[in-house]
Design a protein with these regions (language model features):
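Helical subdomain adjoining the active site within ATP-dependent kinase catalytic cores
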Residues: 2, 207-284
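Residue-level detector of conserved, function-critical positions
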Residues: 283-392
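Conserved structural core of kinase catalytic domains
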Residues: 71-118, 168
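ATP-binding glycine-rich loop module of kinase domains
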Residues: 31-33, 39-72
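Catalytic-loop of the protein kinase fold
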Residues: 127-148
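Activation of the activation-loop gatekeeper triad in protein kinase-fold domains
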Residues: 157-162
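Conserved activation segment of eukaryotic-like protein kinases, specifically the C-terminal portion
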Residues: 169-184
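Juxta-kinase regulatory segment immediately upstream of eukaryotic protein kinase catalytic domains
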Residues: 1-34, 68
């Protein structure tokens, strides 16, 4: 059997036999090629015909690779000689090198809410594109995602991907446990195999943006604060303590679509049928010029605000009031939030023990749990120094 060292030596040796990639030169450090060894392959950064490329040499055969990568996959490309002199032809992959750092590295480097939100936005954009395609990655995790300098994200290492021609086959791998639904099996192999991973990573990034302890946990251990198995209650529909913490955090801040995606993590199945629709709201630009906005209900009995046939505020809330004076008052997880119809931002939030109504004549009245009342003007809502000023 070939060793990693055998392949590294062959790539480094200038007179190795290549079927089509003659002239390829690996990047070197202290006289040895720079490489990363994985479960079934060794990857190198190389120069080929004047361009920087990624070369991947496989230690074992994977019959799916040609369908996944097309012309970039080169079967029996490199001749490798093992320590006893036997010759082996190794399958290779040559692709454009993606500049940037892994999402794992980016998470550990992020220190502010803005940096985490930028990572979350980049991931959500990539995820929505993937959900709209007919393929799936199969092993999404921070180490398999590159963050470019412009914030865009690119998934790498598609060796366990699903493409339509694989319909009816079993998956060669079932992904990394920390980012997969515990019920995923090799028989679950279609375009939905990334559903749970996408929901999990998106939730993790948004949660770390507003919960420092989750970010610090990842920096220290390079793993999520909670595992998928901690989010699924096998005995009922009530959220586990870990999931309840996430939902409470999102509900307090009026993070509606993030809240609904997080709810899906309690699913008994890896397939999340509503994920594409709900995450799609994260990519919809807000229209601050909408007219005749009214409260309407949508799928699942969730509420939002419409202008004609178009959703101005996505139907993701558990209740609400008719918009008035440029504000919509909507409820999420028993918290009420005033949302600006000009910007779409949550301008003020009220905790579950407080009863507050919509704006009338420029004011809203808040009744607290102890029976005390307070009148709050529209200007106070808009000019609050922080969105959660009324949440204890």
């Amino acid at each position: 059997m070939l060793s990693i060292a055998d392949i590294v030596d062959a790539v480094a040796f200038p007179f190795s036999v290549w079927r089509t990639l003659g002239g390829l030169a690996p990047e070197m450090c202290d006289g040895r090629p720079v490489y990363v060894a994985g479960n079934a392959a060794v990857s190198f950064c190389v120069t080929y015909r004047g361009e920087r490329k990624m070369l991947k040499c496989y230690t074992r055969t994977n019959e799916n690779l040609k369908a996944i990568y097309g012309a970039a996959y080169r079967a029996n490309e490199l001749c490798v000689i093992d320590m006893v002199g036997r010759h082996h032809w190794v399958d290779c992959l040559l692709m454009d090198y993606v500049e940037g750092r892994t999402l794992d590295e980016a998470i550990c480097a992020a220190t502010t809410e803005a940096e985490f939100l930028a990572l979350a936005a980049g991931f959500d954009s990539m995820a929505c594109e993937l959900l709209s395609s007919e393929r799936a990655h199969g092993d999404l995790k921070p180490e398999n995602i590159i963050v470019r300098d412009d914030g865009q994200m690119v998934a790498i290492d598609w060796d366990n991907a699903y493409v339509p021609s694989f319909a009816g086959r079993r998956s060669p791998e079932i992904g990394t446990a920390a980012y997969q639904h515990p019920a995923r099996t090799a028989d679950m192999f279609n375009k939905h195999v990334d559903d749970y991973s996408i929901a999990f990573i998106s939730t993790l990034l948004h949660f770390m943006a507003v919960e420092e302890s989750a970010a610090e946990h990842y920096r220290q251990l390079h793993e999520p604060k909670f595992m998928p198995s901690e989010l699924i209650n096998p005995n009922g529909w009530q959220p586990t303590s870990a999931l309840a913490e996430v939902l409470e955090t999102f509900a307090r801040r009026g993070m509606a679509w993030e809240y609904r995606v997080a709810q899906m993590l309690s699913s008994a199945t890896p397939y999340l049928s509503d994920l594409k629709r709900v995450m799609g709201f994260s990519q919809s630009p807000f229209d601050g010029n909408a007219e005749d906005v009214s409260l309407e209900y949508g799928p699942h009995g969730w509420w939002g605000c419409k202008s004609g046939e178009r959703w101005v505020i996505a139907p993701l809330y558990s209740g609400g009031f008719e918009p008035s004076e440029g504000m919509a008052l909507l409820e999420l997880g028993a918290y009420r939030h005033f949302i600006s119809l000009e910007s779409g931002d949550v301008v003020a939030s009220f905790d579950r023990a407080t009863n507050v109504g919509p704006l009338r004549d420029g004011v809203t009245r808040m009744r607290m749990a102890d029976g005390q009342e307070r009148v709050i003007t529209r200007e106070e809502l808009i000019n609050s120094p922080k969105k959660s000023i009324f949440v204890r």
